């Protein structure tokens, strides 16, 4: 009797769960069919090289389909598992059926709409499209369905077929009866578990290293930027861009006047070092939190200050050093686009923004076109910070992370493999790359909680803040890296570029202001000793590395860049940073703050290095010329970003 009562209470619930799972499975099938149609219709643009590549993209697409399906089905899941006997009535079941069919039909319409729209944009639709076409006549969209009637009919047919199949799925036949406590308890457990799993699935994984899956993660599964749309689906693209800040379309001046003050098109080849290092390998070392403050050799004006980078101090004596180096951002996730592609964050990190699918001019891709092999090294768990996805978008062909290192005994317990161990791995692994090569390495040990291996805790200087010893550790790790690298046959034929991802406010008051917080070392080391010196006059930034490195190795083709080449003294030298909606422009001895509408501050960094005196209303300053240049810069940047024109030399405006 007890078993029968419990069964009569739980059997309808089991049928409801089975129906929910079958609906999820059907959704996966529908999304895959839409992806297949997308692929067939746009195969000429996708340029898929092999069946293996196609299979990988479809496999990767399931990850994004899962995220979209669980998010769009969250209401259905909740309503299906509510501990209510009324949820098994015929009327309630019809309501669930209607909800599921409406949501899935909308997904079909969105996905098939992008089958055609992709041919105009080469990316999935995001919420930016509603801003872009917000003022257009809505009947223009209806015309879209008429003009592409074949896809419209296909969509109608797919919706009808979907509804027929969904109608044949078995429904619960009865309401729960008997021991209702078992029904209520089991329903609550299933409801809570389903909501938790939905959040995890929508986020993209269980691990603490996993950030919410976003558009740029699709780059893991592709070979060409335009293929990303095949991996993604349109509901996911729309969901992931909800609430993402979009850039305003600045209209400070006619576009014809913009090049008078700033020209984003740059042609290398006119500096004394242009092409001097043609055919050289390039190793780019991105040092986590490598602030200028830590380097004694860059703070000789501070009496008695030694710093915490004795190796870097010695290396700078044999290098070319930009003493006025700046980061363009304050986060690691923003540094990668700036360093690799001269792309500043569009209010939010580029890789998390609605513009992350834009075409970019990237250093690895340009070098690849010149015959370079390309690799990226980062000792964190693969997928951390979305680096693997972005560097593939930037054209990197080989990725080496914690997975490839394959020795968890060297894991620091927080971020990844200790720098000392991983940099030795990098030095050895680089030798397997075909020359000429481009290899980038992103360190990680000088990061909170600023731990160092136990054997060095009593050896390395501790300084006054925990960060100091962590910096000293990475400096030591780099010394050992160069010792190993110097014994390799590729060493003398390599240019080494050392830059920070961002600065970190430390102990010195000189760096506790809006400009000091961005100051970083930028160092170019040539083992042959052909490039030695100090540039104490010109500004340099992360965004300058793209045009500068390409100029050094002999790429003389024009490019779009929002950085510059500090070796080129014919162009104005300035740096722009986005400080949470306030743009900071540093030019000469001045720092200008601008909120997009009005100037909020101007400081003379030479006479007022601590930025205590706002002189924006003082006459005789360079504010007018700086403001015109900044406005031209922002107007061109925002327009190119919004309309995916970051690679076009002469776009139609």
Model-derived segments and spans:
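Transmembrane and membrane-interface helices of multi-pass
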Residues: 2-232
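Short, motif-level signal for alpha-helix interfacial/capping segments enriched in acidic residues
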Residues: 43, 92, 265-269, 479, ...
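Conformational gate/switch positions in structured elements
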Residues: 66, 115, 142, 289, ...
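Soluble catalytic regions of membrane-associated enzymes that act on cell-envelope
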Residues: 204-560, 569-574, 579, 609, ...
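Membrane-interface soluble catalytic domains
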Residues: 529-653
